[in-house]
């Protein structure tokens, strides 16, 4: 009886949204340029307007990251703070949009872009894969992102490591295709509790967001839960971040959506 109960609870915890896999198939086979088609060799920084232009020119989908500024605007930026990319100690959430858009990226003349400007640039030329960065359980970013994306006429997917963010979309914007990001989070140093990271790593938080797809780190696969979801529910699996020819080949052969970080040979294809 206990074993049966555990199996039932496990299935309840990991089960995704399965009714919209036909919609997800439109994204199968798409290669998304991780943070745009950026390259130090070409002087194109990550999550920059030039990286997004390059991806559009090569007809790649674009994966990008969103933070909410102190004054409630959305900017495209990956890290939790500005140290690595901009040489400043603050977090994106600590500054206004005006302050952030003055910050240059990795020593170039490129600046942190506003999400609205990226949407205007892409303008449905290629699909978008939008990751929400949600520190301190601030769901205001979900509302703001939805306000902008519902008036955008292009194809997009939304994803986050934060299952509460996916839950917000499930309840308030169920039409948006949403994905659970994950990896072997328990191996990483983090301020987030080990137990929460364990749950997200094993996709036990799927009961909150009921994701339409799973985006998992390729080098952390195979993973039992991911394998079970593929076999029994046909769940779409995206893999990240593919940086070599072998990884790209594996991603294309074994999984549905590929998120790559552009080797020079790919940029010049």
What kind of region is each of these model predictions?
Residues 1-269:
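Phosphate-group recognition and catalysis centered on beta-loop-alpha active-site segments
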């Amino acid at each position: 009886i206990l074993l049966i109960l555990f199996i039932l609870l496990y299935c309840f915890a990991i089960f995704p949204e399965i009714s919209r896999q036909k919609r997800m198939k439109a994204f199968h086979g798409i290669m998304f340029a991780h943070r745009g088609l950026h390259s130090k060799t070409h002087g194109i920084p990550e999550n920059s307007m030039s990286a997004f232009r390059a991806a559009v020119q090569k007809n790649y989908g674009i994966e990008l990251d969103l933070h909410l500024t102190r004054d409630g605007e959305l900017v495209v930026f990956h890290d939790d703070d500005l140290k690595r990319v901009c040489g400043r100690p603050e977090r994106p959430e600590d500054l206004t949009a005006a302050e952030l858009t003055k910050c240059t990226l990795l020593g170039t003349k490129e600046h942190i872009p506003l999400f609205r400007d990226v949407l205007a640039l892409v303008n449905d030329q290629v699909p978008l894969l939008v990751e929400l960065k949600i520190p301190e359980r601030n769901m205001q970013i979900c509302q703001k992102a939805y306000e902008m994306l519902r008036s955008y006429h292009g194809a997009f997917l939304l994803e986050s490591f934060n299952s509460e963010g996916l839950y917000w979309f499930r309840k308030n914007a169920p039409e948006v295709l949403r994905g659970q990001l994950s990896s072997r989070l328990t191996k990483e140093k983090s301020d987030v509790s080990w137990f929460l990271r364990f749950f997200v790593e094993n996709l036990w938080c799927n009961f909150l967001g009921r994701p339409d797809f799973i985006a998992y780190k390729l080098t952390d696969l195979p993973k039992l839960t991911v394998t079970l979801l593929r076999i029994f529910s046909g769940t779409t699996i995206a893999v990240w971040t593919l940086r070599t020819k072998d990884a790209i080949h594996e991603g294309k052969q074994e999984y549905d959506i590929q998120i790559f970080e552009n080797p020079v040979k790919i940029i010049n294809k």
